[in-house]
């Protein structure tokens, strides 16, 4: 009897150990499936949208970006007065580029690392656990002259891969952003590692169309930020 109990305990411990080993892979697979569903729902909503409505959403985003540039507002100085000044026809940041109710404003694709993630408003934990967060106070990721969108992503979560492989990107690589029917391709021009407080220098440059991808580094330490700078080529 004692031997049977020990055998059962050994089996249970083995199964528990196997579960611990498999958890990251299984959890990541489930999270990727969720991300695919969110992107598919976004694509369907966009496809069913009238062209007039689609054009209006993009026009609002373009106007928001123009206001940012004209007023010289950056994310590190974003207070209530600045948010008020950035209203577009009474709409706040969170109400712009809403194709459907999930809060997805578009999606990011990086072919080199086989990544496809939804882009959400803001950089809350909820947003970063499910995809990429757009930093409020930076240009919305719809392209255009004198724009600089900043997108954040987590790295090394046990439940999802997200930006874990972002450090594999090199100068000359490309990534793509799709917002409604606007498809934008960016080429990596530079990579940097900075302290968190050094992000304040990321502002729009005259006549340039830029996006910076941001994640924590070194892996597992997270004391600095890895910046992948891209400039639009298509």
Cite the ranges covered by each PLM segment.
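N-terminal Sec-pathway targeting helices
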Residues: 1-14
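Solvent-exposed, non-transmembrane regions of membrane-associated and secreted proteins
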Residues: 14-234
């Amino acid at each position: 009897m004692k031997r049977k109990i020990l055998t059962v305990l050994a089996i249970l411990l083995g199964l528990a150990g196997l579960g611990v080993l498999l958890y990251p892979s299984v959890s990541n697979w489930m999270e990727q499936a969720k991300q695919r569903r969110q992107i598919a729902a976004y694509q369907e909503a966009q496809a069913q949208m009238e062209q007039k409505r689609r054009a209006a959403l993009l026009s609002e985003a373009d106007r928001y970006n123009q206001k940012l540039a004209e007023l010289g507002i950056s994310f590190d100085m974003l207070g209530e007065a600045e948010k008020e000044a950035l209203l577009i026809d009474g709409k706040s940041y969170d109400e712009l580029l809403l194709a459907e109710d999930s809060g997805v404003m578009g999606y990011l694709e990086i072919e080199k690392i086989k990544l496809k993630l939804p882009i959400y408003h803001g950089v809350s934990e909820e947003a970063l656990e499910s995809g990429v967060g757009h930093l409020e106070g930076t240009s919305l990721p719809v392209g255009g002259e004198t724009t600089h969108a900043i997108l954040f992503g987590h790295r090394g979560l046990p439940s999802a891969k997200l930006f874990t492989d972002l450090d594999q990107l090199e100068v000359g690589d490309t990534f793509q952003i799709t917002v409604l029917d606007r498809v934008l391709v960016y080429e990596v021009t530079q990579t940097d590692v900075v302290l968190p407080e050094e992000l304040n220098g990321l502002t729009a440059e005259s006549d340039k169309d830029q996006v910076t991808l941001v994640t924590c580094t070194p892996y597992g330490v997270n004391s600095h930020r890895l910046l992948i700078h891209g400039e639009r080529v298509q």
